[in-house]
UniProtKB/Swiss-Prot annotation:
Organism: Ruthia magnifica subsp. Calyptogena magnifica
Membrane-spanning intervals of the chain: 11-31, 42-62, 79-98, 113-133, 134-154, 167-187, 211-231, 248-268, 279-299, 313-333, 335-355, 378-398, 408-428, 457-477
GO molecular function annotation: NADH dehydrogenase (ubiquinone) activity; NADH:ubiquinone reductase (non-electrogenic) activity; quinone binding
Subunit structure, as described in the record: NDH-1 is composed of 14 different subunits. Subunits NuoA, H, J, K, L, M, N constitute the membrane sector of the complex.
Swiss-Prot/TrEMBL keywords: Cell inner membrane, Cell membrane, Membrane, NAD, Quinone, Translocase, Transmembrane, Transmembrane helix, Transport, Ubiquinone
PANTHER family in the cross-refs: NADH DEHYDROGENASE
Principal subcellular localisation of the protein: membrane
Function statement: NDH-1 shuttles electrons from NADH, via FMN and iron-sulfur (Fe-S) centers, to quinones in the respiratory chain. The immediate electron acceptor for the enzyme in this species is believed to be ubiquinone. Couples the redox reaction to proton translocation (for every two electrons transferred, four hydrogen ions are translocated across the cytoplasmic membrane), and thus conserves the redox energy in a proton gradient.
Gene (UniProt): nuoN
Protein name: NADH-quinone oxidoreductase subunit N
HAMAP family linked to this entry: NDH1_NuoN_1
Amino acid sequence: MNNFIEFDTSSLWIALPEIFLLSAIVIVLLIDLFLDKNFKQVTYYLIQLSLFITGLLAFNLIDHPQIIIFGGSFVLDNMASVFKVFMMAATMVAMVYSRHYLRTHSLFRGEYFVLVLLSVLGMMVMVSGYSLLTLYLGLEILSLSLYALIAIARERADAIEAALKYFVLGAIASGLLLYGMSMIYGISGSLNINDIASFASNTNLDSRETLIINFGLVFLVIGIAFKLGAVPFHMWVPDVYQGAPTSVTLFISTVPKIAAFAMLVRILVDGLDSMHAYWSDLFMVLSILSIALGSVVALMQSNIKRMLAYSTISHVGFIMLGFVAGTPIGYGAAAFYMLVYVLMSLAAFGMIILLNKQGFEIDQISDFKGLNKHAPWFALMMLIIILSMAGVPPLVGFYSKFFILQQVVSAGFITIAVIVVIFAVISAYYYLQIIKSMYFDETDKKITIYASIDIQLVLSINAILILAVGLFPDFWMKLALSLF
């Protein structure tokens, strides 16, 4: 712990993306205070510029040899840099999609943008955290920002209710996570991930030490499973996705998943990989439950945000399944799936926002009726997105599922793979409901696209990218594998 006192300023360049973003938050907040409400566009462009420069700084650190600084609490490695670039890109896209929605729902305010930047800062700390304390600090910065974002539409009772549910359940999950961390710290004597890894790999551990580590592991897995939205810790997901403003749902469903995945890797792969035999069984149960419940309950939903919430739970199950194999290729397959999920989810919620207009919010599957007749290009884009989510070849959603199942079979869990395939087939049905609504159901209502050209352009690129990555998945899979 004394290492925390030794603060070497010559190493600050390693945390330059975080330092720049923190400075940008302060500057944007100050500038926004003096801007008239008619000039909030300036704040929007400032945060986009801040995200772009932060992403550029992180990109310049890709392929840099691993460096651990600040007394072992902060790490620069390839995974951290790549994830930060993806987080900046995904947040920029999410903000482009959200701009029209924020204007029409009177949420185009400086505090919204600052909260987004604060949550991104928390995620960056989580991605580079290399001690239990740093990881928890990043998680709380993220969580507190998200609580406020969900409740930012103060006049909406469902948004306030969703924020309260998320806050209460999040506080319980944070307590469980902290309790698990305290047990690991108590038995290993260190908060540092490297020290914990050395202790856990010690073959001379007695039964008492092994028991305490296992108990700590259980609480850690429960805490992280809640943040990911895995069954049975998923209760907040449907309510938050449905109750929060759609722009917030878009953000919550995508970028924080990258940070939660990174936290999972730091604690369980970097720190407790030698205990894989213990935590892999937990992951297997959680992943199967998530895939099963997410696939079945989504069939009963008519609200598209709620349906996509259960779809997210199912996707989280697939991501966790990649960890069961316990190999670098398995972890790489999980990372690939996670990045693909973010790409698909951005596009799906982007389509929902695209169809929103003043005084009317798209939230039912039936609202997509006749989309092909009135906006055939965007019906085609939605078709690509939905088929990819369903795992139809040759789209990227198919390859992400295939790589995960390949690793599960390679690890000898053939029965698990068969069960997962069955539920994947079941899940295709609720995706087909949207396609049926767009192409085969008639409506008297005329669908008009009110969104600006930049949103339409970025959304089209997003959907085409899903198709392109599916046709040429090798580069992205190699990138994911290079992280481990």
